[in-house]
Amino acid sequence: GGTIASQEGEDGLEPKTTGQQMLDLIPELQGLCEIDCVDLLNLDSTNMQPEEWAVMAKAAFEGMKNHDGIVITHGTDTCAYSAAALDTMLTNPKVPVVLTGSQLPAGEADSDAAHNIHDAFLAACGAPEGVYLAFDGRVIHGLWATKIRTMGFDAFVSVNCPYAGKIADGKLMMQETAKEKTVAAATVESAVDVRLDSKVAVFKLIPGFDPVLLETVVDLGYHGVVLEAYGCGGITNYRRNLLPAIEKMIHKGMVVAATTQSTFDGCDLSQYEVGVRALKLGVIPAGDLTTEALVVRTMIALGRWTDKKDIEAFLRGDMSPVDRSVPLTAFIE
């Protein structure tokens, strides 16, 4: 983990605390379950990269063969990327795989580490099979988590998908949708697939964005681009027109996908002319997917397939079980 396992070093906080040292801070875990502790990595999450996603996915897959649940402590800054990666790399995991972290190091007074670790173990013991992030009393499906705070304990929210569950007064309560997903997948064989292509760039559009920036990635050997577009999927096509550069990328065989800069409600390129023209060129709309999830799935799609139809089908969003008439936070409030 990052912050959760950090201690003061020569140049600031750095990961040093072992898994067992963290567990020793939480006597409430005694009697809850039997724990095997593995120090898999000890990295600030800023330094977590696609190679580490593969390490975690393989370790989780091996661990679930003789355990009833998996807990992974992780730095918060890139935890949403790792959660999305594990959710995608692990097909139908047979146990709950639960990531967690903290905003203050485990050894500090008033740290949220013990609370979050305890909640993660409750989820690992009682949640349906799947990948989750447990944080500040909330359980989020792995693909739909995003970090919204740098310091507040309620650092993560579920985006465009109902919360999987909540933990209150030491009790885990799961949404029915999470249980239904498990029943539907019960006959699918469990597997791990860590293939990916990390040559993916992300561009956040801003007023005055220079199309030359998009053209550079073609010559640098990138295979995919994620565009953080405006609103429902607006991509500039006036004055500093981005469409010729996008057309060039697609003609060269690159995958170009679009999401929104807005946190909630997703991307729909079919609503406005500034989205429709990009859609006609072959830009893939990511629907409900967050930027983190889209980046991860683009890398994984490029690693698994060469056929654009397969990649597009994999990247198109709208996969979350969302009832737009019900607030996403209804279950946890």
Predicted regions span which residues?
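Short acidic, glycine/serine/threonine-rich loops at helix termini
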Residues: 7-12, 83-84, 109-112, 142-147, ...
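ATP/NTP phosphate-donor binding region
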Residues: 2-62
